[in-house]
C-alpha cells in the first residue's frame, strides 16, 4: 500500500533484541526484590554445640539461604597484618566432621571447609562469605593495616589469597569455597573513620580486578553496629557505597553490662519505658542509617537466636526495667536445672551449648516457656518476648515467632534488603525460628 513502510529485517532484529533485553531487565528487577537471607556459622561451634554444616542440610535451612557467613577469619596483629585461619583443625584438618553429601572428603581438605564445598555442590545458588575479625578479634591489625595505602593493599591481597583463591595452607587448597568477605571490625575509632572506608575501597578494587581474570562476581559486606556510640565513627554513606550489603546488628540493645533489665532486640521504643533516655531500638537504628545515606536495599536486619538474661530481678512489671543483681546462670539444655559444670574446656553433658552466664540459646528458651516456674510475656509496644521466673528472680529477653513476624513485616514495608541470623546452631533442631524469618521475608 502506498505510504506504508515495511519493517526492514535489521529493524525487526533490533526490535526483537530490545524486547528480549526488556524481559531480561524486568527479570533482574524481580530478582532484586527478593529479600536476602544470611546466616552466620561459628567455626568453633562444632565443639560446643555439636552443630555442623551437615545440619544445615538435614534441617532444610541450606536451601533457604542466600549467604552463609563463616565466622571468623583472623587479621593478625602487629606492624604487617595478614589474614589467617583462626582454627585450622576445625577449618580443614578434622576428618571427623560429618559429611554433608555422604561422600568421603577429598584429602587433604576435611573439616568445615570440606563440608561447605559439599554443601555448595548440593546448592549451587549458595554464596559463602568469610567474616574477618569479630567481637573477640584483635582490632590492632585492622588499625595498623588501614593506616597506609601499602598496608591496605598488602592485607587485602593476603585475605584474597587465603580465602578467595583458597590457598589455606601449604599443600592445601580450597578453590571456589568463599565468594567474598564480611568485614567485622569491632569497632573503628574516630581516628579510623577515613581509613575504614579506604580499606573497604581496597577490598572492592582488588575483588573487581580479580573478576577480570575469573569472571566471577565477588561479594563484599561489612557488619555494622546497632548503637550510635559504635557506628558514629563510620562514614556510613561512603562505606555503604563500597559494599553489596551491610549486616546490621538487630540486637545488643541490652547486655551483660547493664544494671537494669531491658529488651535486647526491640523493634520500637515506647514512651512508658523508664529507661528511655538510655535505650534504643531497631527502628531508630534503621532510620539513622537511612538518614546517613545507606540505601534501604543494602540494610540486612540481624536476628538473635539466643536470649539475654539476668537474675536477682524483683517481681515487678514481668521483671522488665528492674534493677538486677547478676547474670543468669548456665542451664541444662532441657531447662530442668542448672548446668553442674559450665566450663568450656570440659563442660557437663547436656548443658546449654553457649556455656555463658547471661545467655541461653533459643533451643533452651523453648524448653522454659511457661514451664519450671517461668511465665512468658510479650511486649506488643516494643515487639519483644520475655520470660520471668518470680521465685528465682530470673528474667530473659529474646525473639519468638510473634516478634519475628512483626519484624519481617517491617523489613518488607520499609523495603530493606533482608535479614540474617546470629548464629546457626542456637535455634532448635528443626530451625523453627530461622524458618519463621524466611517465611516472613516472602
Where does each model-flagged region fall?
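Bacterial N-terminal signal peptides that target proteins for export
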Residues: 3-13
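Bacterial N-terminal signal peptides
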Residues: 13-22
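Glycan-recognition patch characteristic of GH18 chitinases/ENGases
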Residues: 30-168, 333-352, 356, 434
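Surface-exposed amphipathic alpha-helices with a cationic face
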Residues: 31-34, 112-129, 133-134, 197-214, ...
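Extracellular low-complexity, Gly/Ser/Thr-rich intrinsically disordered linkers
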Residues: 46, 356-442
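Conserved, mostly hydrophobic/aromatic
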Residues: 68, 130, 183, 203, ...
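Substrate-binding surface in catalytic domains of secreted glycosidases
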Residues: 81-106, 189-355
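An active-site-proximal structural segment forming one wall of the substrate-binding cleft
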Residues: 148-181, 199-202, 206, 231-242
